[in-house]
């Protein structure tokens, strides 16, 4: 399916304009568990332009990373931008940055000791990946995961993958239920996110009163975002009867589901849909902004109601970006942001998916129909010749990995370091890590890999320290080894190891640092 540049640009413009509208509408009601059903327009004084809102800020930082690193941008690069250019340290943001500084790489940084790993801070960053990969939800989901795992995991990560896939597909599909089905194919079917969205759809199909639907969605995956600023005895009773308190930090499933609920009940009306999202309470700037961006992509900027656009006057106000250095150029308007994004997209998707010399101008090649859904694993007989076969993990399979798998990609091979469920070690108790290598199926050569574990003097290795492993390129081929070591009582509180992989007869190599923290733990990791 072809997406011509003028249509694409209008949809990107609609995305950011809708994001801006929703964020401004919902901001005054954020962190409040209440039903805001009487709100039908902005409540702030906008005479001097929109108020700052963090829902758009971080994506401006990610755009700066893409402008420098292009399609090679990954979780590690985004982590560097977190440390340099993102100022807030609240909950998951601060924990993610703290873990990075301690030497824990993504996805460990987003998971370890992160009470808010399932919260809303990353699904609000999905639009940049959708706009850079229009009509390519598989690609958008891949980059959304790289973004999410820096400061989230599990349900928080699923939420960004879901919204990125949905918004990417929205460039070529407009039916809400079809788009929801597409996006759900990229996340685990048994996730709380999937259950909450299923409840939202069930309520709409059965025409449940919207107030009651809000309660049902909440109770399916109860979070606590609406309690952030209240003591327990300050929570309003009105409209909250029967609502469970929820689990702190478990906020993404219900808030994404609130956006879907409002979209369905809004039945195509931009303003009504956003006001319904706002009516649900909890993380209202996020739910409204995500829905506004989604509708903006579907409708395009030209079809968004002027009533909502005019008070904002195309302006962007930022809150969370470190502007004291030259690393990030902050756009002043939605138009400037749009121009910068559309300039990067052809390079981001590559020449196979974008023809810049097409008659009439730039044209994007988009997926359609079943091609928008997450692909299923190729079902080849193990051991077959892998030549010209796509046997990489699908986005859904990667999302299902535990956060203790740190993955690395190199030109001639990929590596997975499995921390085996923990980032801790205990002196005197054997500790293990598993290294898995997969050959590159673009280089088409069998090879041997030499894998070596380097440890400080305080750690004795009880397995072979160096192994030679064959890397074949048939279906299902992988090379795996487990290193076992024991730190003695002189070990520091932070133990740093190096896994070195070198290919025989090639200059390619890869080094992974493994960081472990001293703690009381059971043996057998």
Roles of regions detected by a PLM:
Residues 447, 452, 489-525:
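Terminal connector regions
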Residues 479-490:
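Short, hydrophobic beta-strand segments
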Residues 100, 109-117, 131-136, 145-150, ...:
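Accessory "access/gating" subregions that flank catalytic or transport cores
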Residues 469-479:
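Short proline/glycine- and polar residue-rich coil/turn motifs
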Residues 21, 25, 32, 38-41, ...:
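Catalytic phosphate/nucleotide-handling subdomain of diverse soluble enzymes
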Residues 1-64, 77-78:
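An N-terminal structural lobe/cap that precedes and organizes the functional/catalytic core
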Residues 358-426, 458, 462:
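Low-complexity, acidic Ser/Thr/Pro/Gly-rich terminal tails and inter-domain linkers that flank the onset
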Residues 427-443:
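Short beta-strand elements of extracellular/lumenal beta-sandwich folds
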């Amino acid at each position: 399916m072809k997406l011509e540049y003028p249509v694409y640009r209008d949809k990107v413009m609609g995305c950011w304009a809708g994001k801006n509208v929703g964020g401004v509408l919902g901001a005054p009601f954020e962190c409040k568990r209440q039903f805001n059903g009487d709100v039908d327009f902005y409540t702030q004084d906008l005479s001097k332009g929109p108020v700052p809102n963090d829902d758009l800020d971080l994506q401006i930082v990610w755009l700066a990373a893409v402008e420098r690193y292009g399609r090679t941008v990954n979780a590690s690069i985004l982590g560097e931008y977190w440390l340099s250019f993102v100022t807030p340290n609240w909950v998951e943001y601060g924990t993610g940055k703290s873990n990075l500084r301690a030497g824990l790489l993504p996805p460990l940084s987003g998971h370890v000791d992160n009470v808010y790993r399932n919260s809303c801070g990353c699904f609000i960053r999905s639009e940049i990946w959708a706009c850079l990969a229009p009509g390519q939800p598989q690609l958008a989901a891949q980059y959304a995961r790289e973004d999410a795992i820096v400061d989230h995991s599990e349900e928080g990560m699923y939420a960004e993958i879901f919204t990125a896939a949905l918004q990417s597909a929205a460039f070529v599909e407009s039916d809400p239920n079809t788009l929801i089905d597409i996006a759900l194919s990229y996340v685990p079917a048994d996730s709380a996110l999937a259950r909450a969205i299923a409840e939202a759809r069930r309520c709409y199909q059965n025409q449940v009163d919207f107030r009651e639907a809000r309660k049902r969605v909440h109770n399916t995956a109860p979070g606590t975002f609406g309690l952030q600023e209240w003591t327990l005895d300050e929570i309003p009773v009105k409209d909250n009867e029967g609502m469970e308190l929820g689990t702190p930090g478990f906020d993404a499933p219900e808030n994404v589901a609130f956006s879907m609920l409002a979209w369905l009940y809004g039945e195509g009306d931009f303003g009504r849909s956003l006001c319904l999202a706002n009516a649900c309470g909890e993380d209202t700037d996020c739910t409204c902004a995500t829905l506004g961006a989604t509708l903006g992509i579907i409708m395009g900027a030209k079809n968004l109601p002027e009533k909502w656009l005019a008070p904002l006057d195309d302006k962007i106000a930022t809150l969370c970006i470190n502007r004291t250095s030259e690393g990030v150029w902050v756009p002043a308007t939605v138009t400037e942001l749009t121009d910068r994004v559309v300039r990067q997209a052809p390079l981001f998707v590559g020449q196979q998916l974008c023809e810049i010399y097409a008659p009439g101008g730039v044209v994007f090649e988009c997926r359609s129909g079943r091609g928008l859904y997450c692909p299923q694993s190729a079902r080849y007989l193990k051991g077959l010749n892998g030549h010209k076969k796509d046997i990489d993990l699908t986005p859904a399979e990667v999302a299902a990995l535990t956060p203790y798998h740190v993955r690395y990609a190199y030109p001639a091979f990929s590596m997975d370091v499995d921390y085996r469920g923990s980032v801790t070690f205990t002196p005197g108790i054997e500790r293990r890590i598993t290294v898995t290598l997969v050959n590159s199926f673009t280089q088409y050569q069998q090879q041997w890999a030499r894998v070596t574990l380097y440890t400080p003097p305080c750690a004795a290795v009880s397995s072979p320290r160096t192994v030679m492993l064959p890397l074949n390129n048939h279906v299902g081929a992988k090379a795996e080894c487990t290193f076992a070591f024991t730190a003695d009582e002189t070990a520091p509180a932070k133990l740093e190891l190096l896994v070195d992989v070198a290919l025989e007869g090639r200059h390619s190599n890869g080094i992974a640092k493994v960081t472990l923290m001293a703690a009381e733990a059971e043996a057998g990791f």
